[in-house]
Design a protein with these regions (language model features):
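Positively charged, low-complexity intrinsically disordered leader regions
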Residues: 78-79
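Interhelical loop and helix-boundary elements at the membrane-water interface
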Residues: 1-73, 82-132, 136-345
């Protein structure tokens, strides 16, 4: 995820030291030895993965917070809940490894998916799990459509192919944060906001994946003039319909799995709100892409690209937008926009 290099030996040492420290602390509580090792292993494994994708000292924050979250859940819930949480961890491992093998994710993307999956599967359970799995599985499959056509855009878009950790964080991170906030301060609205953030991610992803299949050039959302396929801020009829379909699917799944099947959480009004928020966020994403997202020009081939480095790793020159505002940050802003929109209207 960053410039720091991590090794298997280092991660193994991290896991073992964390296991010993957590087990020693839990042993003082008088819990059974089996439970101590069980809980310590879960905490140590989660903390190790948090450390593996951290960089530039951020592990000083991610490791203790991640370990505290898992430990708090295990110590404040029943053994049955802890068993279900363990199944969630196992499920997160399977999803991350399988996605890595299928080249849906890079190694850092798989690690980030495990962290996000543990939180969603283990704490949120099925009501939170099914929407994010729907987004991830269907979006990953869509990314494989028109592979040859999309390969031609590799020089323009910042990232392509297997999704890395930042892409996972950009699309699923806001939802994961909302779930954690809902865990700390329980309220039905958190699920609604969670669904809205995923509707935004689904609408944007489906709009992009389906839109690139269009035989006609997209048009700028600002000027409505034709722009090359893959240009940030470009929209098309088929891409917009793809965004609407993605938001509709996510809203529908959220309605079907709403906690306790309570209409008070996601009824018809909430369903329409999630659907509309997803579409609005997708358009907001395109607007940011056309106006504020960083655009660079390669000094070698003169192509305009989202990449900060292009031909043979040569550093590109910024020609528009804000240098720090890349596609991942635009996606996070779009998810935040969807959440804010729901808060205002609801």
């Amino acid at each position: 995820i960053g410039p720091d290099k991590k090794s298997v030996e280092g991660s193994t040492a991290m896991f073992l030291s964390s296991l010993v420290i957590v087990a020693a602390a839990l042993a003082l509580t008088g819990r059974p030895a089996g439970e101590v090792l069980w809980f310590a292993a879960l905490v140590a494994f989660f903390a190790t993965v948090c450390e593996a994708i951290s960089y530039q000292g951020s592990d000083n924050l991610t490791v203790p917070l991640g370990a505290a979250l898992v430990l708090h859940y295990l110590l404040t819930h029943t053994r049955g809940d802890a068993a279900i949480f363990s199944l969630g961890v196992g499920m997160a491992v399977v999803v991350a490894l399988l996605s890595y093998r299928l080249k849906f994710l890079s190694s850092s993307g798989a690690a980030a998916t495990f962290i996000l999956g543990t939180i969603v599967f283990g704490i949120g359970r099925w009501p939170y799990t099914l929407p994010i799995l729907t987004f991830f599985i269907l979006s990953s499959l869509l990314s494989k459509l028109g592979k040859r056509r999309k390969q031609k855009l590799a020089g323009m878009i910042e990232k392509g192919g297997a999704r890395d950790a930042w892409q996972v964080i950009a699309n699923g991170g806001p939802g994961g944060l909302l779930l954690i906030l809902g865990y700390i301060w329980p309220h039905p609205i958190w699920f609604l906001l969670y669904a809205a953030s995923l509707a935004a991610a689904t609408a944007d992803t489906w709009g992009t994946e389906i839109g690139t299949l269009s035989r006609n050039d997209p048009r700028s959302i600002v000027t409505f003039k034709p722009v090359p396929v893959g240009t940030s801020g470009g929209i098309s009829v088929i891409g917009t319909l793809g965004s609407a379909l993605g938001s509709l699917v996510l809203a529908g799944v959220s309605w079907l799995v709403t906690p306790q099947n309570s209409p008070a959480v996601v009824g018809l009004r909430e369903f329409m709100l999630i659907f509309a928020a997803g579409i609005a966020a997708s358009l907001f994403d395109s607007l940011l892409g056309a106006t504020l997202q960083a655009r660079f020009r390669c000094p070698v081939c003169s192509k305009v690209t989202e990449k900060s480095h292009h031909c043979r790793g040569v550093k590109t020159e910024i020609v528009g937008g804000l240098a720090w505002l890349n596609n991942d940050r635009v996606n996070m802003a779009a998810a935040a926009f969807a959440v804010l929109l729901v808060l205002i209207i609801y």
